[in-house]
Amino acid sequence: MAAAPPLSKAEYLKRYLSGTDAGLEGGPESGRKRRKKRPKPGGAGGKGMRIVDDDVGWAAISTDKLEKEEEEDGDLPVVAEFVDERPEEVKQMEAFRSSTKWKLLGGYSEDGHFHNDDQDPSPPRKARHDTPDASPPRRVRHGTPEPSPPRRVRHDTPDPSPPRRVRHDSPDPSPTRRGHDSPDPSPTRRVHHDSPDPSPPRRVRHDTPDPSPPRRVRHDTPDPSPPRRVRHDSDASPPRRSHRNSSAVSPKRGHHGSSGTSSPRQAHNHSPAAAQHRRTLDSSGAQHHRRARHDSPDLELPKAKSSKAAERPSSKTVSQSGLGPPHPSLSMNSKYEHDSDLSPPRKRQAKAHFGAKKQLDSKGVCQKASDSDLSPPRKNSKSGHQDSDSDLSPPRNRPRRQSSDSDLSPPRRRQRTKSSDSDLSPSRRSPRSGKKTPHMYSGAKTGLVADVQREHQELKKQDQDATDLGAQFEFTETVFRDKSGRKRNLKLERLEQRRKAEKDSERDELYAQWGKGLAQSRQQQQNVEDAMKEMQKPLARYIDDEDLDRMLREQEREGDPMANFIKKNKAKENKNKKVRPRYNGPAPPPNRFNIWPGYRWDGVDRSNGFEQKRFARLASKKAVEELAYKWSVEDM
């Protein structure tokens, strides 16, 4: 089949634009029939059902809306509008007051006026759990403006911003305590409902101005009011957790003396320390220094304190000292009113001291102001304040503690009341009077010349005694003692050892003779004697040799007619001698050990023939060896 001719671009474009009619009119494809496409099942034909599971997240919706709004705003014409140049706080307050989303308890009176008893410049805290607010806390950044509607707010503060849960580890230059008369630029936290409230009585905080009697105040604020109970150290740390209701661990504290974003922190519920940590220095600025707690922002250690056990001495101190009127809610909140910190001491900020080293309180007790003490205040019943710059208030009934600069040690026992500026050394024992006299660096005593001479004489005498003692025992003989402690005589021991060795050698020789055999030893000795005797004779033996003739005569020969005569003569000779009887019968068969039979043997062999077989085997073996030797040497 021939290939179709190629089409030009113009022709192809013409057919494409004209649709199917152009294809039918001309070209080789015009005669072909096109197949109808079948509609796919489940398509747009209306048959079946399609389920689309597409969950759109809130983040995507919010971003899409923002983008669309921006695009629409770009298309709209530019129109002059009213610009509200008021501060952000005022705008938020207006929006908060005009909003109906929030129901305030005790914040507004019936006439609609907002009771702002406490302008709080402090950063937000977490609300106590005894407040009737069930809204959840939000975790936000304190540096970004919050456009969301206000959340849980203090009932006595004009801040409509939402509460935040704050972090414990970012340094914060903003004030962290509640000021009494400075506007609040920082976002609010969950707060205590301690403003005038028609609701039932609650545990109130001691840092809000209320009609109760005055409490301790800060020692560096020119405050003519009666004393209030405050912390005497600029606390840069978040409130600690008590065993009961607060267990917040704050690894870092921010410095809260400069304006800026508020310090992130998470104040725990019912924290008694939060009530006393949040007080400002003066009443004019929005951000002022707090008096530092005896801890630095970075060296804070985790601590857990028992509010119940730690606050009872505080209430006792207030009632006994009588320097300030008692708080009406003292009986109810005595366990929350004072921060008796049992945590390890920390460095104190030198923020609120302003160079004051020593100051006298109303009773004239002088106490050193420790500029960089890191330890928390200890309970002390003595009056005396460490750091009061311009304190015009009456004397406070505040526990005095022993301040120690750069003190990182664990809390001391409360019996110690003396303050030491920078004494980190262990306690010294005072020299006992009358026991030791002072000495100079050379070691000599101080005093009269006669005493010095007497000392020299004593030293010389001691040296002489030591020399004499050394000379006395220089050439002495060493004394050896046994285990019982008695002296040992080495010479006598050597003699005893020698005698014992000789006796042992004799016994060994006797056992050696017995082991070799006495008969063999006697026979060997006899052979030696005979050999010596023969050596003394001439070289050749003759017939006239008496010894040779006797030996030949005593021999017994088989078949000798004179054998019986010889035996009888020997028997007669040996009759008078006491000799054991011996077998004298015919020659017995040989055995392995050459044992002679007893004198009563009758000559009958009653053995099993083992001895005879043994000797026959030995004889045959020897014969074979001789035959082999002869065969090996026969051709030589």
Swiss-Prot record:
| Keyword terms | Coiled coil, Isopeptide bond, mRNA processing, mRNA splicing, Nucleus, Phosphoprotein, Spliceosome, Ubl conjugation
Annotated compartments: Nucleus
Entry's Gene Ontology cellular component terms = nucleus; U2-type precatalytic spliceosome; U2-type spliceosomal complex
- Which segments carry the region annotation Disordered? 18-55, 64-83, 106-469, 554-597
- Compositional bias of kind Basic residues: 345-356, 429-438
PTM annotation (Phosphotyrosine): residues: Y511
Keyword hit for Methyltransferase: no
What coarse category fits the chief subcellular location reported for this protein? nucleus
Q: Where is this cross-link: Glycyl lysine isopeptide (Lys-Gly) (interchain with G-Cter in SUMO2)?
A: K65
The highest taxon in the source lineage is: Eukaryota
Transmembrane regions listed in the UniProt entry:
none
- Protein name in the entry: BUD13 homolog
Q: Which organism is it from?
A: Rattus norvegicus (Rat)
Instruction: Tell me what gene encodes this.
Output: Bud13
